[in-house]
Amino acid sequence: MEKKTTYHEQKDVENILRLREVLSTLPPFCRDYFRAIDTTTTTKTRISYAYDIRIFFQFLLDENPAFKDYKMTDFTVDVLDQIKALDLEEYQEYLKVYQAGDKTETNGERGLKRKISALRSFYAYYYRREMIETNPTVLIDVPKIHDKSIIRLDTDEVALLLDYIEHCGDQLTGQKRVYYEKNKERDLAIVTLLLGTGIRVSECVGLDIEDVDFKNNGIKVTRKGGNEMVVYFGPEVEKA
Protein backbone atom coordinates (compact mmCIF):
# COMPACT_ATOMS: atom_id res chain seq x y z
CA MET A 1 0.00 0.00 0.00
CA GLU A 2 1.38 3.39 -0.98
CA LYS A 3 2.28 5.59 1.97
CA LYS A 4 0.08 8.66 2.32
CA THR A 5 1.94 11.92 1.81
CA THR A 6 1.36 14.40 4.62
CA TYR A 7 0.62 18.09 4.13
CA HIS A 8 4.09 19.05 5.34
CA GLU A 9 5.79 16.55 3.03
CA GLN A 10 3.83 17.92 0.06
CA LYS A 11 4.74 21.50 0.98
CA ASP A 12 8.40 20.58 1.39
CA VAL A 13 8.55 19.13 -2.13
CA GLU A 14 6.91 22.29 -3.48
CA ASN A 15 9.34 24.47 -1.55
CA ILE A 16 12.40 22.53 -2.74
CA LEU A 17 11.32 23.04 -6.36
CA ARG A 18 10.66 26.70 -5.66
CA LEU A 19 14.10 27.10 -4.08
CA ARG A 20 15.78 25.56 -7.11
CA GLU A 21 13.92 28.00 -9.33
CA VAL A 22 15.13 31.00 -7.31
CA LEU A 23 18.71 29.67 -7.14
CA SER A 24 18.80 29.42 -10.93
CA THR A 25 18.49 33.22 -11.07
CA LEU A 26 21.37 33.88 -8.64
CA PRO A 27 25.12 34.01 -9.36
CA PRO A 28 26.33 30.39 -9.67
CA PHE A 29 28.71 30.59 -6.70
CA CYS A 30 25.74 31.12 -4.35
CA ARG A 31 24.80 27.45 -4.60
CA ASP A 32 27.76 26.51 -2.37
CA TYR A 33 26.29 28.55 0.46
CA PHE A 34 22.81 27.09 0.14
CA ARG A 35 24.14 23.53 0.09
CA ALA A 36 26.10 24.31 3.26
CA ILE A 37 23.05 25.51 5.22
CA ASP A 38 20.78 22.71 3.97
CA THR A 39 21.02 20.65 7.17
CA THR A 40 20.63 23.55 9.60
CA THR A 41 17.71 25.47 8.06
CA THR A 42 14.23 24.74 6.75
CA THR A 43 13.49 24.94 3.05
CA LYS A 44 11.26 27.98 3.68
CA THR A 45 14.14 29.75 5.42
CA ARG A 46 16.45 29.03 2.49
CA ILE A 47 13.84 30.38 0.06
CA SER A 48 13.62 33.59 2.10
CA TYR A 49 17.41 33.89 2.18
CA ALA A 50 17.61 33.29 -1.59
CA TYR A 51 15.12 36.10 -2.26
CA ASP A 52 16.94 38.39 0.17
CA ILE A 53 20.34 37.74 -1.38
CA ARG A 54 18.91 38.25 -4.86
CA ILE A 55 17.70 41.68 -3.75
CA PHE A 56 21.27 42.48 -2.62
CA PHE A 57 22.73 41.65 -6.02
CA GLN A 58 19.92 43.56 -7.74
CA PHE A 59 20.85 46.55 -5.58
CA LEU A 60 24.44 46.31 -6.86
CA LEU A 61 23.20 46.19 -10.45
CA ASP A 62 20.82 49.12 -10.00
CA GLU A 63 22.79 51.42 -7.71
CA ASN A 64 26.52 50.70 -8.04
CA PRO A 65 28.16 52.14 -11.19
CA ALA A 66 30.96 49.56 -10.96
CA PHE A 67 28.49 46.85 -11.95
CA LYS A 68 26.39 48.72 -14.51
CA ASP A 69 27.42 46.32 -17.31
CA TYR A 70 26.88 43.16 -15.24
CA LYS A 71 24.08 40.64 -15.37
CA MET A 72 22.99 38.82 -12.20
CA THR A 73 24.77 35.62 -13.22
CA ASP A 74 28.04 37.48 -14.01
CA PHE A 75 28.91 37.99 -10.35
CA THR A 76 31.68 35.81 -8.91
CA VAL A 77 32.62 35.33 -5.27
CA ASP A 78 35.47 37.86 -5.43
CA VAL A 79 32.94 40.66 -5.91
CA LEU A 80 32.10 40.32 -2.21
CA ASP A 81 35.56 41.69 -1.37
CA GLN A 82 34.80 44.83 -3.37
CA ILE A 83 31.87 45.77 -1.12
CA LYS A 84 32.59 48.17 1.75
CA ALA A 85 30.65 48.95 4.91
CA LEU A 86 29.47 52.21 3.31
CA ASP A 87 27.94 50.21 0.45
CA LEU A 88 26.01 48.12 2.95
CA GLU A 89 24.75 51.20 4.77
CA GLU A 90 23.48 52.46 1.42
CA TYR A 91 21.88 49.04 0.91
CA GLN A 92 19.99 49.37 4.21
CA GLU A 93 18.66 52.72 3.09
CA TYR A 94 17.72 51.25 -0.31
CA LEU A 95 15.74 48.45 1.36
CA LYS A 96 13.34 50.87 3.02
CA VAL A 97 11.72 51.66 -0.36
CA TYR A 98 12.79 50.18 -3.70
CA GLN A 99 11.36 49.18 -7.05
CA ALA A 100 10.98 45.51 -7.97
CA GLY A 101 9.71 45.52 -11.53
CA ASP A 102 6.43 47.44 -11.52
CA LYS A 103 6.00 47.14 -7.75
CA THR A 104 7.22 49.42 -4.98
CA GLU A 105 8.53 47.31 -2.10
CA THR A 106 9.01 48.51 1.47
CA ASN A 107 10.63 47.06 4.58
CA GLY A 108 10.05 47.85 8.21
CA GLU A 109 12.31 46.91 11.12
CA ARG A 110 11.71 43.16 10.82
CA GLY A 111 12.18 43.06 7.07
CA LEU A 112 15.41 45.06 7.30
CA LYS A 113 16.78 42.87 10.08
CA ARG A 114 15.99 39.66 8.21
CA LYS A 115 17.66 40.84 5.01
CA ILE A 116 20.79 42.04 6.79
CA SER A 117 20.92 38.81 8.82
CA ALA A 118 20.70 36.79 5.60
CA LEU A 119 23.55 38.80 4.10
CA ARG A 120 25.66 38.37 7.26
CA SER A 121 25.20 34.60 7.12
CA PHE A 122 26.05 34.63 3.40
CA TYR A 123 29.26 36.60 3.92
CA ALA A 124 30.27 34.58 6.98
CA TYR A 125 30.18 31.33 5.00
CA TYR A 126 32.66 32.52 2.37
CA TYR A 127 34.83 34.33 4.93
CA ARG A 128 35.19 31.25 7.17
CA ARG A 129 36.22 29.18 4.16
CA GLU A 130 38.81 31.81 3.19
CA MET A 131 37.18 32.38 -0.18
CA ILE A 132 37.05 36.12 0.59
CA GLU A 133 39.36 38.29 2.68
CA THR A 134 36.90 40.76 4.20
CA ASN A 135 33.51 40.66 5.87
CA PRO A 136 32.04 44.17 5.97
CA THR A 137 28.69 42.92 7.30
CA VAL A 138 30.15 42.78 10.83
CA LEU A 139 30.86 46.53 10.65
CA ILE A 140 27.24 47.62 10.25
CA ASP A 141 24.48 47.69 12.85
CA VAL A 142 21.51 45.34 12.56
CA PRO A 143 18.19 47.22 12.84
CA LYS A 144 16.69 47.05 16.32
CA ILE A 145 13.25 45.48 16.64
CA HIS A 146 10.76 47.32 18.83
CA ASP A 147 8.25 44.99 20.46
CA LYS A 148 4.60 45.42 19.58
CA SER A 149 1.82 44.69 22.04
CA ILE A 150 -0.11 41.48 21.36
CA ILE A 151 -3.77 42.13 20.56
CA ARG A 152 -6.04 39.59 22.26
CA LEU A 153 -9.79 39.12 22.14
CA ASP A 154 -11.57 39.46 25.47
CA THR A 155 -14.30 37.05 26.58
CA ASP A 156 -17.13 39.11 25.10
CA GLU A 157 -15.35 39.48 21.76
CA VAL A 158 -14.76 35.72 21.58
CA ALA A 159 -18.46 35.09 22.25
CA LEU A 160 -19.48 37.60 19.57
CA LEU A 161 -17.15 36.03 17.00
CA LEU A 162 -18.43 32.49 17.61
CA ASP A 163 -22.03 33.69 17.63
CA TYR A 164 -21.48 35.43 14.31
CA ILE A 165 -20.11 32.26 12.72
CA GLU A 166 -23.05 30.27 14.06
CA HIS A 167 -25.77 32.65 12.85
CA CYS A 168 -24.33 34.87 10.09
CA GLY A 169 -25.96 32.72 7.42
CA ASP A 170 -29.44 32.60 8.92
CA GLN A 171 -30.79 35.05 6.36
CA LEU A 172 -29.18 33.37 3.37
CA THR A 173 -31.24 31.44 0.84
CA GLY A 174 -30.69 28.96 -1.95
CA GLN A 175 -27.20 27.72 -2.76
CA LYS A 176 -25.55 30.25 -0.44
CA ARG A 177 -27.52 28.83 2.50
CA VAL A 178 -26.60 25.27 1.52
CA TYR A 179 -22.91 26.22 1.36
CA TYR A 180 -23.10 28.01 4.72
CA GLU A 181 -24.79 25.09 6.48
CA LYS A 182 -22.31 22.65 4.97
CA ASN A 183 -19.30 24.53 6.37
CA LYS A 184 -20.66 26.09 9.56
CA GLU A 185 -19.59 23.32 11.94
CA ARG A 186 -16.18 23.11 10.29
CA ASP A 187 -15.65 26.87 10.61
CA LEU A 188 -16.74 26.85 14.25
CA ALA A 189 -14.36 23.98 15.01
CA ILE A 190 -11.43 25.73 13.31
CA VAL A 191 -11.97 29.08 15.04
CA THR A 192 -12.58 27.42 18.42
CA LEU A 193 -9.35 25.44 18.00
CA LEU A 194 -7.39 28.60 17.16
CA LEU A 195 -8.88 30.50 20.09
CA GLY A 196 -8.54 27.61 22.53
CA THR A 197 -4.94 26.66 21.79
CA GLY A 198 -3.25 29.76 20.41
CA ILE A 199 -1.73 27.87 17.48
CA ARG A 200 -0.87 29.75 14.30
CA VAL A 201 -3.14 29.62 11.26
CA SER A 202 -0.32 27.93 9.32
CA GLU A 203 -0.08 25.26 12.05
CA CYS A 204 -3.82 24.66 11.83
CA VAL A 205 -3.64 24.35 8.03
CA GLY A 206 -0.88 21.75 8.41
CA LEU A 207 -2.92 19.42 10.65
CA ASP A 208 -3.76 15.95 9.33
CA ILE A 209 -6.39 13.62 10.83
CA GLU A 210 -3.59 11.53 12.34
CA ASP A 211 -2.36 14.59 14.27
CA VAL A 212 -5.52 14.82 16.41
CA ASP A 213 -5.65 12.72 19.60
CA PHE A 214 -9.04 12.85 21.31
CA LYS A 215 -7.95 10.29 23.91
CA ASN A 216 -5.50 12.76 25.43
CA ASN A 217 -7.06 15.92 23.97
CA GLY A 218 -3.94 16.93 22.10
CA ILE A 219 -2.87 17.90 18.59
CA LYS A 220 0.57 17.42 17.08
CA VAL A 221 1.62 20.65 15.38
CA THR A 222 4.71 21.50 13.37
CA ARG A 223 6.09 24.73 14.74
CA LYS A 224 7.90 27.45 12.86
CA GLY A 225 11.33 26.00 12.18
CA GLY A 226 10.03 22.45 11.67
CA ASN A 227 9.94 21.24 15.28
CA GLU A 228 6.94 19.10 16.29
CA MET A 229 5.14 19.43 19.60
CA VAL A 230 1.86 18.38 21.19
CA VAL A 231 -0.56 21.15 22.12
CA TYR A 232 -3.38 20.20 24.48
CA PHE A 233 -6.93 21.54 24.32
CA GLY A 234 -9.86 21.83 26.71
CA PRO A 235 -13.46 20.59 26.61
CA GLU A 236 -14.73 23.59 24.61
CA VAL A 237 -12.40 22.70 21.75
CA GLU A 238 -13.23 18.99 22.02
CA LYS A 239 -16.98 19.66 21.76
CA ALA A 240 -16.54 21.98 18.78
Annotate each language-model stretch with its function:
Residues 1-240:
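Conserved catalytic core of the tyrosine transesterase superfamily
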